[in-house]
From Swiss-Prot:
Belongs to the peptidase C14B family. The active site is at 247, 303. Involved in cell death (apoptosis). Residues 7-18 have a biased composition (Gly residues). It comes from the Eukaryota. Its EC number is 3.4.22.-. The keyword Hydrolase applies. Residues 57-83 have a biased composition (Low complexity). It comes from Cryptococcus neoformans var. neoformans serotype D (strain JEC21 / ATCC MYA-565). The gene is MCA1. It is an enzyme of class 3 (hydrolase). GO terms for cellular component: cytoplasm. This is Metacaspase-1.
Amino acid sequence: MSWNQYPGGGHHQQGGYGYRPPPPQWAQQGPPPPPNMGYRPPPPPQAYYNNPPPPQQYQRPAPQQNGYQQGGYQQQQQSQGNYRTSNGGYVPPTGAPVEASYHHTGAGYTPPSGTPQRTSAPYGAGAPIRPPSQAQHYGPQLQGQGGQSAQPYFQYSQCTGKKKALCIGINYVGSSSALAGCINDAHNVQKFLIERYGYKSEDIVMLTDDARNPRQIPTRANILAAMHWLVQGAQPNDSLFFHYSGHGGQTPDLDGDEDDGYDEVIYPLDFKTAGHIVDDDMHNIMVRPLPAGCRLTAIYDSCHSGTALDLPYIYSTEGVIKEPNLLAEAGQGLLSAGMSYLRGDTGGMLQGIMGIGKKVMNQNSGAMEKARQTKTSPADVISWSGCKDSQTSADTQEAGRATGAMSYAFIAALTKYPQQSYVQLLNTIRDELKGKYDQKPQLSASHPMDTNILFIC
C-alpha cells in the first residue's frame, strides 16, 4: 500500500450553513451505554461491541475553531516516511507509535465472483439515469433581506473531478474486543474503488493497525488529520469516499440534536487514552466545509452507525423519507433556514424556522428540528451504514475470509449489479445480508434526493 501524498493541512470553512459551535461540555460522562457494544472474531457472526469497552479515563479537549483541534499542522515541503507532504501538510503527533503485533496477510477475502453482471438490479425497471447536473431547487420561496426571494437548493455531483478516499480498518489486536475482518475490509474497499470507479492508489489514504508507518496507524489524531485531508480543497463534481470498519457505539448527546438522546461514535485504536470520535465532529469536519455539487460517499461498517455522519434525510427501502425520523415538511423548512444562514440572511432564517408547522415542531422534543436546521447541506453527501442506530453490525466470514458484513455486502451488491439506483442498491445490500444477519443497512443523505437516479462515486 502506498501513501505518496498526504497534503493534510487545516480545515477550511467554506461558508457554514446554520453552523453553531459545539457546546463547552466536553467531559465524557462515563462509558458508552451498555447494550450491544462490541463484537468478537468469527467463525460465527458476531456483533460489534457485545461488551462495552473499558471506561475511558479522559476529558474531551476544550473545543477550538469548528470543534476540532488544529494542533500539529505545520507548513512544510519535505519527505516524511514513504510519502510526501505538500505545502499545508501536517506533522504527525508526538510520542511512541502504537506497536503492531502481527503482519498484514493480504488484501482479505476474494471479491464475489461467479455471478454474471447485469445492467440493473432486480428492483425497479430498466437502468437508472445519471443525476442531473443543474442545481435542484425545492420548497417554498423565501423572502430575504432587501426584498429578494430565494429558494433552498442542493446540487448532485457528476463525480467527474478529483477523486480522493480514506479507508480505515481497526482490528484492535491484542485487546479484549479484538476484531478479525476490519483490516481486510479497508483493503478490499481500496481495491474496489480503484478497479470499479477509477480512484488512484496515490489518492487513497489507508489507516490500519498493522501499518508500519506511524502516520498510518488509526489513532484518534491520525484519523482526524486524515478526515481534514479528505475534504481539503474540495470542489464541485469532486468525488470523496470515506470508509470505516471497526468498533462503534453511543454516548450521551450533549447538544440536543439526537431524538434518542445519544450521539453515535467510532473508536480509534487509542480510544482508551485519547477518546472516541463523535458524529457531530465527523459532520463538522467532513460535511460542513463541502461546496454544493461535491460528493462525499461514506460507509460505516460498525455498530450503532445509522446516523454516524449526522445526515438528516434517512430513506426507506421504498426510496422515501422515513417517518417519523424525518418529516419532509420539517426538512424543507429547516433546510431553508440553513440556506438563509449561509447567505447571512438571518431574517430569512427566522422566517424559514417559523414556517414549520406546529405539529412538526412538537415532535421529539425539538431534536429533529435542531438536526434539520444545522445538518442539511447543499453538498451531495451520502452515507451507507451497516445497521440502525439501535443495532449491532457483524464481524464474520465470507468467501473464507474474515470481513465486516456491510463492507462485503456493499462490494458484492455492486459487483453483481454495477448499474444501480440508490434505492436498488439499498435493497440489494439488504438482500446480501438477509437470512444471515439481523442488521438492516441504512441510507441517509444531506439533502432530499431522488433515490431512483444512478448511484455513482
